[in-house]
Regions:
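Metal-dependent phosphohydrolase cores
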Residues: 1-223
Length: 223
């Protein structure tokens, strides 16, 4: 739940709805000057790949479906917990990612993108010198421990499990006639980065979570 106070008004936006906005942004990404989603590199059947990429971006937070249907409540305020409150429970967050990466078994490429999205959210704390190209906009100004607090043992174990999931998903993709061309670094890495970027843009429009590059972070599309 993205809970934002703005102009004396409380706004609540569910994680799945924010995800769909990210998918809409991705669907409109690209023009004559830069590449559309799914068309990076030289993939076979790029339009079909585009559908997988858009699904992965739009449903990157699908693991929240069950929680959002019956959200936890802050006992002091009586309001649904915001994202920062909910993420204090590391194990529950990882359980949601397990659900999210398994939701669409007939769409392994979309699921693979979701798994890489999860990987890079945790890598900012766990991996020594993580690749800055995949750093989520949430962390462009640092302080990942605010959203992902606690010891590192659980995240490390989770990321090891993600690696196993990714190998399985990659094999499922390779079973498709287009699979090999879809997994090349020049194809999949830009799609992962696009997910990170569209997620960040959607969060900036829906909340105050993304820090402004300068001045005060306003949220709700005002930055």
């Amino acid at each position: 739940m993205l809970r934002t106070e703005h102009n004396d008004t409380l706004t609540f936006i569910t994680q799945p709805d924010h995800g769909r906005l990210a998918g809409m942004l991705a669907a409109h990404w690209g023009n004559a000057s830069f590449t559309a989603a799914g068309h990076y590199g030289n993939p076979a059947h790029a339009d079909r790949l585009r559908g997988e990429v858009l699904l992965g971006i739009a449903e990157h937070d699908n693991g929240w479906w069950e929680w959002e249907a019956d959200p936890s409540v802050n006992t002091e305020t009586g309001l649904p917990m915001g994202l920062g409150e909910v993420l204090q429970d590391q194990q529950a967050g990882m359980d949601r990612w397990h659900i999210g990466t398994a939701r669409f078994p007939t769409h392994p490429y979309a699921s693979l993108l979701i798994s890489w999205h999860a990987y890079w959210l945790y890598a900012i704390r766990v991996v020594d010198q993580p690749d800055a190209r995949f750093t989520h906009p949430l962390f462009w100004k640092g302080a990942p421990e605010q959203l992902y607090p606690g010891a590192l043992d659980l995240p490390k174990e989770f990321m090891s499990g993600l690696a196993v999931t990714q190998k399985r998903l990659e094999q499922n993709i390779l079973d498709d006639e287009c699979g090999a061309s879809w997994l090349g670094d020049d194809v999949i890495k830009p799609n992962i980065r696009l997910l990170q970027l569209c997620d960040g843009l959607s969060l900036a429009l829906c909340s105050k979570l993304i820090p402004a590059t300068s001045g005060i972070t306003n949220g709700l599309g005002s930055d």
